[in-house]
A protein has these predicted regions:
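Short, low-complexity, polar/charged sequence segments that are solvent-exposed and flexible
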Residues: 27, 72-75, 174, 190-191
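Short secondary-structure transition/capping segments
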Residues: 28-30, 114, 183-187
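Functional-site microenvironments in short loops/helix caps that host divalent-cation chemistry
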Residues: 56, 121-124, 132-202
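A short glycine-rich, aromatic-capped structural motif
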Residues: 2-25, 33-125, 129-130, 135, ...
Length: 202
């Protein structure tokens, strides 16, 4: 999502979408013009990107996150889900025994208020409004009518990690997530506060 959205299409290749969150950098009206390296844009051949995922290019990444300093990281190319996990998808994880199959939770260290918990004790805290394992806002182990395609909310990091393992994936590490979701230009000159005022969020 951003102010400028470009789509590149070529027969035999996956469509590539480019987003510019803050076009002031591109249109040269920023008070301190930044310098960018001009490089070719590589597209992925058809059949090389898993369904409902997108390919993120590797290379240098300077996250500039608060408290992290300005560190230069080199990331390898990777895939990330194109859409959020829906209530319906998470319900299938539950129905398939997600909270009962230990391999999805293996090697996790469950901590609450500074104390370690067993997997069994931790699961007792991962419950919905009726005490059944599931997202916090659900009732009797299911989402509300009409909300099957909404993004799932009210789950812990542990549950998200277990779901990712169930799908044969992992949760993206911090810097991989930042590179995919948060343009560096938004850090340098954020435009989100302006857009938020004009958004239709209640």
């Amino acid at each position: 999502r951003g102010v400028v959205h470009l789509k590149l299409s070529k027969e035999g290749f996956h469509t590539k979408e480019l987003v510019e969150a803050n076009p002031s950098f591109t249109f040269a009206n920023h008070p301190i013009p930044p310098t960018f390296e001009i490089s070719k844009i590589e597209m992925n051949k058809e059949g090389t990107v898993p369904d409902n995922m997108i390919a993120i290019d590797g290379g240098r990444f300077i996250p500039a996150l608060i408290g992290e300093g300005v560190t230069d990281y080199k990331l390898s190319p990777y895939f990330i889900d194109k859409f959020e996990v829906t209530n319906k998808q998470f319900k299938k994880f539950i129905d398939d025994g997600g909270y009962e199959i230990f391999q999805y939770w293996k090697d996790m260290e469950f901590i609450k208020d500074g104390e370690s918990l067993s997997w069994e004790d931790a699961k007792e805290l991962m419950v919905d409004s009726t005490g059944v394992n599931g997202p916090l806002s659900w009732e009797l182990g299911s989402y509300r009518n009409g909300e099957e395609n909404l993004p799932v909310t009210g789950i812990s990091w542990y549950e998200a990690q277990a779901y990712a393992r169930y799908k044969g994936n992992i949760l993206p590490p911090m810097y991989h997530w930042a590179k995919a979701a948060f343009p560096i230009t938004e850090i340098a000159a954020p435009i989100s506060p302006v857009l938020l005022k004009k958004s239709n969020f209640s």
